[in-house]
Swiss-Prot record:
Taxonomic lineage of the native organism: Viruses, Duplodnaviria, Heunggongvirae, Uroviricota, Caudoviricetes
UniProt superkingdom: Viruses
Protein name as it appears in the record: Uncharacterized 32.4 kDa protein in Gp30-rIII intergenic region
Source species of the chain: Enterobacteria phage T4 (Bacteriophage T4)
The encoding gene: y12F
Length: 278
């Protein structure tokens, strides 16, 4: 089984807001905040996005997520390059809060298959304001998950608690909250640099196994009768712990005012001989 990279989609792989101008034009909705969101990637509430009350804003979000505009969202350039490169060695699973309708699921699959053909083996979905905790548990049981990427702090925190794998926070714009444990990344290139390819992991494992086999073989073939316990050797005057000083004080090149006789006559006096050297 290939190692699996679990990832959010909107704001990480695809620009969710890239279809909003066309959706707004179709239903004669204000474009001011939509165009600004496309530029700065800042996450804002549905009510503010559509310049209406929050309840109506949520309904418009849900309608947009079920619309055909979701089929043609633009990818981020780094995501397009890196995911299509990594798909040879890694399996990808999408964990997205686009909605739980069949229309949203089919539209998302269409979009991902067009831009990342053969990369995503499954799309796990929940409603846009729901927690992804159940999706994380399902993915953990089914796949060999090695990491997770998201742009929202609370999803990163839940992933850290459940998946117990590296979690990367890829916030492309300003966010109100910061995750507690996730590592900050800015693009998919940063994620790629943190990964070891399956080939490299296998080579590392093979090297460790080879070293272990050599050590076990040496131990097995060793015929020397090693003692089973360590013993501290007794004192031996012919082989002391600290070698005797072979140069007496008289030969040390320390000078103190008064001549060499000073060291000859008072080698152990109260005046430290080291003080006499300076």
């Amino acid at each position: 089984m290939k190692p699996t990279i679990l990832t959010d989609i909107d704001g990480v792989c695809l620009s969710w807001q890239s279809g909003l101008p066309y959706f707004a034009q179709k239903y004669n909705l204000p474009l001011e905040h939509i165009l600004k969101m496309i530029q700065d990637e800042k996450f804002i509430s549905p009510g503010k996005l559509f310049n209406c009350d929050e309840e109506l804003g949520v309904k418009l979000i849900e309608k947009y997520n079920r619309s055909d505009f979701i089929r043609y969202l633009s990818p981020y350039k780094d995501a397009l390059c890196v995911i299509n490169k990594l798909k040879e060695d890694y399996n990808f699973v999408a964990v997205t809060a686009l909605g739980d309708s069949i229309d949203a699921l089919l539209n998302r699959q269409f979009n991902l298959n067009a831009l990342f053909p053969g990369a995503f083996s499954e799309v796990l979905m929940c409603s846009h304001d729901s927690s992804k905790e159940e999706l994380f548990k399902k993915a953990k049981e089914k796949y060999n998950v090695i990491c997770y990427i998201d742009d929202l702090a609370h999803h990163c925190d839940h992933a850290s608690e459940i998946l117990r794998v590296p979690v990367y926070w890829m916030a492309r714009g300003e966010r109100d909250n910061i995750p507690k444990t996730a590592q900050r990344v800015y693009t998919w290139n940063d994620v790629e640099n943190k990964l070891f390819s399956p080939k490299e992991n296998k080579e590392s494992f093979d090297s460790e196994k080879a070293i272990k086999d050599v050590i076990e073989k040496m131990i097995k073939n060793d015929s020397f009768p090693w003692n089973t316990t360590w013993r501290t050797p007794g004192f031996n005057p012919y082989n002391p712990y600290h070698p005797y000083q072979t140069h007496p004080f008289q030969t040390w090149n320390y000078i103190k005012p008064g001549g060499i006789e000073y060291l000859y006559n008072r080698p152990t006096c109260g005046d430290n001989i080291f003080q006499g050297a300076f």
